């Protein structure tokens, strides 16, 4: 078969994008095969942030393993703690108090806002708009303050626990979160004023990185990447956990499967998160914030000061941990980036025999090649941003 005759003016070459590049959203190395300005192939090279998290977890007790999950997707840490806590609770068959469930849902939705504000702000920055970044970081600061007040940390919260949460909400926090819910929709509206009908923004996002329904399912996409293609799949609705089944909210889906649709879905999800948080505040009862089973939950400080048995129990839980019944379970949550899952295999000891982590960004990055083909180099930056990738969870 005769080879296709190439024009003497055409020039094909390979371009290395990253890993030290701000628009790759982490340590992504992309080898792009270019025909002039057009991308013919995109080959992602990952593993530069690999820390062996899954293996490290095997050497820790179930309680000691929780902080590792904050360091996976470090933009939305509490949602990953949530998945690990649910997996352990399934094996332990322990009941989570109602107040703790509402607290976990509320902070999961605050985490969703934390994630989406950063994604939209950095995506706008990548295409040349700087104002959204400044506006959204101001809002993120407020949520990080809520994190700090409830857990002592702005980022790596280590707040969720098997059976509940580590401590109750401090005085005045619930009122401050309610105030935030009243003013934040106006900030989203301001952001939409800047971007949604902006013709430059639409030129950079409409019909860029199109993913069909079939492609989204074939590549194992989830979250916004799946709903952007018109598939209404959200684990909070389809496989509800904690109190999501008792909360009223809508699932936003797109029509065209392009970067613009995915941006609109993230905007709508922030509105829905505010709606969920308001319901959590209204419905949250008084009561315990973690299970009262002494074999799982450490005693209160007031008890430790009065009872030697409580002190011994506290010491044993934090040093030796507790044994989890033998078995295996897969627990997944609707994290901001998609379905974050934890497969946990217990051999009946105080440490996981195996912990397999399913990160949504890993599947999404695999689809970069087919999404990028035929687009210009500048469009690749937009596609990387719309994938919403963080290499803590991809490389693990």
UniProtKB/Swiss-Prot annotation:
Enzyme nomenclature, EC number: 7.1.1.-
Function: NDH-1 shuttles electrons from NADH, via FMN and iron-sulfur (Fe-S) centers, to quinones in the respiratory chain. The immediate electron acceptor for the enzyme in this species is believed to be ubiquinone. Couples the redox reaction to proton translocation (for every two electrons transferred, four hydrogen ions are translocated across the cytoplasmic membrane), and thus conserves the redox energy in a proton gradient.
Subunit structure: NDH-1 is composed of 14 different subunits. Subunits NuoB, C, D, E, F, and G constitute the peripheral sector of the complex.
This protein's name: NADH-quinone oxidoreductase subunit D
Organism for this UniProt entry: Orientia tsutsugamushi (strain Ikeda) (Rickettsia tsutsugamushi)
NCBIfam families: NuoD (TIGR01962), PRK06075.1 (NF004739)
Molecular function via GO: NAD binding; NADH:ubiquinone reductase (non-electrogenic) activity; quinone binding
Bilayer topology term: Peripheral membrane protein
Residue ranges of the TM segments: none
Record flagged with keyword Cell inner membrane: yes
Catalytic activity: a quinone + NADH + 5 H(+)(in) = a quinol + NAD(+) + 4 H(+)(out)
Organismal lineage: Bacteria, Pseudomonadati, Pseudomonadota, Alphaproteobacteria, Rickettsiales
Alphabetized HAMAP family for the sequence: NDH1_NuoD
Annotated family: Belongs to the complex I 49 kDa subunit family.
UniProt keyword terms in alphabetical order: Cell inner membrane, Cell membrane, Membrane, NAD, Quinone, Translocase, Transport, Ubiquinone
Stored Pfam families: Complex1_49kDa (PF00346)
GO cellular component: plasma membrane
Keyword Cell membrane on entry: yes
Enzyme class: translocase
Subcellular location: Cell inner membrane
């Amino acid at each position: 078969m005769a080879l296709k005759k190439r024009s003497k003016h055409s020039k094909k070459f390979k371009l290395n994008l990253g890993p030290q590049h701000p628009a790759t959203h982490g340590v992504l190395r992309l080898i792009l095969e270019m025909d002039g300005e057009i991308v013919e192939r995109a080959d992602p090279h990952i593993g530069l942030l690999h820390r062996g998290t899954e293996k490290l977890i095997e050497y820790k007790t179930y309680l000691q393993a929780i902080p590792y999950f904050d360091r996976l997707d470090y933009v939305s840490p509490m949602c990953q703690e949530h998945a690990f806590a649910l997996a352990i609770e399934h094996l332990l068959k322990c009941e989570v108090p109602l107040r703790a469930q509402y607290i976990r849902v509320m902070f999961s939705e605050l985490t969703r806002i934390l994630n989406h504000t950063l994604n939209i702000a950095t995506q706008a920055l990548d295409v040349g708009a700087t104002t959204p970044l400044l506006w959204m970081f101001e809002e993120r600061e407020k949520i990080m303050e809520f994190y700090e007040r409830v857990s002592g940390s702005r980022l790596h919260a280590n707040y969720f626990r098997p059976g509940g949460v580590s401590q109750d909400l401090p005085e005045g926090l619930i009122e401050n979160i309610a105030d935030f819910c009243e003013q934040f929709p106006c900030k989203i509206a301001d952001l939409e004023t800047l971007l949604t009908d902006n013709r430059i923004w639409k030129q950079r996002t409409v019909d860029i990185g199109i993913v069909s329904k079939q492609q989204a399912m074939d590549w194992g996409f989830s979250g916004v990447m799946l709903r952007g293609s018109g598939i209404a799949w959200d684990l909070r609705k389809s496989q509800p956990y904690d109190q999501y089944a008792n909360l009223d909210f809508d699932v936003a889906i797109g029509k065209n499967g392009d970067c613009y649709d995915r941006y609109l879905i993230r905007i709508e999800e922030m509105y829905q998160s505010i709606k969920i948080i308001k319901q959590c505040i209204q419905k949250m009862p008084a009561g315990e914030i973690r299970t009262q089973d002494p074999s799982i939950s450490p005693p209160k400080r007031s008890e430790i000061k009065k009872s030697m048995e409580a002190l011994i129990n506290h010491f044993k839980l934090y040093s030796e941990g507790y044994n989890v019944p033998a078995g295996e379970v897969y627990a997944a949550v609707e994290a901001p980036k998609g379905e974050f899952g934890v497969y946990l295999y217990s051999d009946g000891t105080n440490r996981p025999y195996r912990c397999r982590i399913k990160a949504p960004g890993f599947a999404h990055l695999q689809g970069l090649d087919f999404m990028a083909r035929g687009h210009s180099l500048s469009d690749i930056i937009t596609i990387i941003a719309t994938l919403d990738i963080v290499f803590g969870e991809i490389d693990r």
